[in-house]
Amino acid sequence: MFEIDYRYLRPKKAAAMKKQHEAAYERQETPAVWQGKNATILPVRKIDASGWVGCGGVVDADGHCVDISAVECCVQPWKGTFAQPEYRDEKVVYCGYMIHHWGHFLVEGVTRLWYFLENDPTVDKYVFALDEGEIRQIKGNYRRFLELLKIWDKLEFINRPITYREVIVPEMAFRRWGYYSPKYLDIFNTVAENAAPATRTVGNIYMSRSLLPKHKDVEFGFEALDDFFQKNGYTVVYPERVPLDEMIQYIRNADTVATVSGSLPQNMLFGKQGQKLIIAERCAIIDDWQPPVNRIKELRTTYIDANIPIYTVPMTGPFIMGYNDIVRRYAQDNAMVPPDAHFYSRKYFRSCFVGYMKSYQDLYRYRWFMEEYLLPEMDYHLEAYAYGEEFYREYLNGSRPFRWHHYLEIHYWKQWLKRILKKG
């Protein structure tokens, strides 16, 4: 049975997180399978400005969409027309969309691969759809995952419509809202079992985002958590720099895995049942893919609000994290030592704030970011932003300057004079 420790979340966020972990979630032993002759597998045609959502999937011989070929987050049923498809005299399995995002690859991209483990001898190929017209080399940990599953040599990746003699569409074995099948976990267990043996083991690991290429532009203060966990005996691991085999062994052999919210905790799908997980929350938003992962892996998870939110932002940031009072309370309760004093100094927190404000302006200028999907969660968002406002009050209310041009503004000189007179 999974266990969740909500004590280190802000109260309203803790209540929302608890609600997600306790939502009805069905276990299905065997997902459904659709099978049809002369069906067409389509590439994904992007339909939104962000380039995230598209339409595609499979259509039957009569041109009707096969409902279970859609992908919850990013591939809607096909709309409109497409080019005259090529015909191939082959029986294939539709594997879904080969999404280029590691977290979504794990929770959406591979969810149909359970059918490969059924060992159907009549299948010629397994087919992934790419974006329409996309030329992409599948490499790195994406390719290694498929190699470890032993499916790589049977795969085809298509970027244009192709009609096959026969197409099998396995249902996704995992959906964040609704259900999962044990066959989904079989995929990850197979990959883990085929991974190269561990060359060394460590007791506790912290999976960090601090060396990601985009980190310096949108993520501020994350190094403080690297230092905090390292000083408390954790081995800091940078997943993007570690081969998948090695990463799997790190996770499976760890006593405790700590990491930052987002895609990184979803790597626990490679882990053992019932492992201990610590998630440092990087923003106000709850990553609603993680609760079902915690449930099906029976993880013993502690959430920590290590973030200092300023404005509403999506999961792409910018963010401030660090050794705030919530992390300090967690450290005290668990007899842990703090990070280097530099990481919780006034100067360091100010530098994080300045970086955040520059990043926010670069991304959004003077617009206020808000999407409809955030509205139902606004109570715990307001709670978070009130926390951030209090943390950085003197900068947000205009009492102290933080950008060079502020020193040219009369307002800030007035504030300085008021402080001098008050001290006198």
Residue map of PLM features:
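The feature primarily captures lumenal catalytic ectodomains
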Residues: M1-W413, I420
